[in-house]
Amino acid sequence: MAKSSATKDAQALFHSLRSAYAATPTNLKIIDLYVIFAISTALIQVVYMAIVGSFPFNSFLSGVLSCIGTAVLAVCLRIQVNKENKEFKDLPPERAFADFVLCNLVLHLVIMNFLG
């Protein structure tokens, strides 16, 4: 009996999350897809390193750190662009995107410097 109530609770939770996410604006969903893509790319690189090896270790670290850093910056962009976030209400979306682009530029310059 406890399993069936736990299953019902889990199904209710997933249903409420799905219905809440359906109301999310499209621009936030696009940012979410970008974050998922960046994280999955990092995971693919880690699996590749585990299977094949990490001979140029600097290249492996640069690729993974680039993916993770880009995902973190995209999450920050999502927080700033979200209309329901009261902390960044005065920040225009164009400014948030410009910050995202500038921080990505700095991140990738550091990554390129790390490559040697």
Swiss-Prot record:
Q: How does it sit in the membrane?
A: Multi-pass membrane protein
Task: Enumerate the Cytoplasmic topological stretches.
Answer: 1-32, 78-95
* Function comment: Subunit of the oligosaccharyl transferase (OST) complex that catalyzes the initial transfer of a defined glycan (Glc(3)Man(9)GlcNAc(2) in eukaryotes) from the lipid carrier dolichol-pyrophosphate to an asparagine residue within an Asn-X-Ser/Thr consensus motif in nascent polypeptide chains, the first step in protein N-glycosylation. N-glycosylation occurs cotranslationally and the complex associates with the Sec61 complex at the channel-forming translocon complex that mediates protein translocation across the endoplasmic reticulum (ER). All subunits are required for a maximal enzyme activity.
Residues that span the membrane, as ranges? 33-53, 57-77, 96-116
Q: State if Transmembrane helix is listed as a keyword.
A: yes
The cellular location(s) given in this protein's UniProt record come to: Endoplasmic reticulum membrane
Say where the protein is mainly found: endoplasmic reticulum
Q: Which family does it belong to?
A: Belongs to the DAD/OST2 family.
What cellular-component terms does GO give this entry? oligosaccharyltransferase complex
| Coiled-coil positions | none
Q: What is this protein called?
A: Dolichyl-diphosphooligosaccharide--protein glycosyltransferase subunit DAD1
Please cite one Gene Ontology biological process associated with this protein: protein N-linked glycosylation
Q: Which Pfam families match?
A: DAD
**Any keyword Flavoprotein?**
no
Primary gene name: DAD1
Q: Please give the residue ranges for the topological domain Lumenal.
A: 54-56
The pathway this protein participates in, as annotated, is: Protein modification; protein glycosylation
Question: Which top-level group of life is the source organism from?
Answer: Eukaryota
Q: Which UniProt keywords apply?
A: Apoptosis, Endoplasmic reticulum, Membrane, Transmembrane, Transmembrane helix
Q: Which InterPro entries match?
A: DAD/Ost2
How is the quaternary structure described? Component of the oligosaccharyltransferase (OST) complex.
